[in-house]
Regions:
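AAA+ P-loop NTPase nucleotide-binding core of proteostasis motors
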Residues: 1-223
């Protein structure tokens, strides 16, 4: 298992540069999650990636999809900025007039997938209630009452919660590393306990150093 885990860490580190702690945390959970595929019940895992934009959160979600399902395109992405209004939850789940909800329909078509929910804190409270049901029960009913199972999905949420507090305490490149408790506290203060407690792991992403940014630029240029 350790060998498998170290191979996975190496593989993910090639995809996501400069985030060793995040890569290690996700590797642990992915190894467990892969063993839970085809288990009935809850999703195989739920992660919350916290940190500034442009530091590798989406890349790590794609790498997770590739590891679990053999294809980085097995990623169903939802930007919660687009689900801020009352009625947003109905769009995701489905209504009598449009029974195929955006989320339920996507998962019915592709039941083995990573579901990436960007900027989770922006979603309407009713949307968060829908996600709470997914995390707790592993299923939703669409507009026609058909059950959609999430038991072969990995839920990855992203958030900027805590970024402002952290940026006030560190300079460029995180010269003085901030304890991860700052991120956890920001998330815990924002969400209701029943939602917070359903998250398997909160994974902090840190501001990239100049050296890492140059390394990323070289990788992009070489592609």
């Amino acid at each position: 298992s350790d060998v498998c885990s170290s191979d996975l860490v190496n593989s993910l580190s090639q995809e996501v540069v400069g985030q060793p702690q995040a890569v290690a945390a996700v590797s642990d959970l992915l190894t467990i999650a892969k063993a839970r595929l085809n288990d009935t019940g809850r999703p195989i895992g739920s992660l919350l990636f916290v940190g500034p934009t442009g530091v590798g959160k989406t890349q790590l979600a794609k790498a997770a999809a590739k590891f679990l399902f053999g294809d980085s395109n097995r990623l169903l992405r939802f930007d919660l900025n687009e689900y801020v209004n009352r009625g947003s939850a109905a769009r995701l789940v489905g209504t009598f007039d449009e029974p195929d909800g955006l989320l339920t329909g996507a998962v019915r078509r592709q039941p083995f997938a990573v579901i990436l929910l960007d900027e989770i804190e922006k979603g309407h409270p009713e949307v968060v209630d829908v996600l709470l049901q997914v995390l707790g029960e592993g299923r939703l009913s669409d507009g026609l009452g058909r059950t959609v199972s999430f038991s072969n999905t990995l839920i990855i949420m992203t958030s900027n919660l805590g970024v402002r507090e952290n940026s006030q305490r560190v300079g460029f490149a995180g010269d003085a590393p901030v304890g991860d408790h700052v991120w956890v506290k920001a998330v815990q203060q924002f969400f209701r306990p029943e939602f917070f407690n359903r998250i398997d792991r909160i994974v902090p992403f840190h501001q990239l150093s100049r050296e890492v940014i140059e390394q990323v630029a070289r990788i992009v240029l070489n592609e």
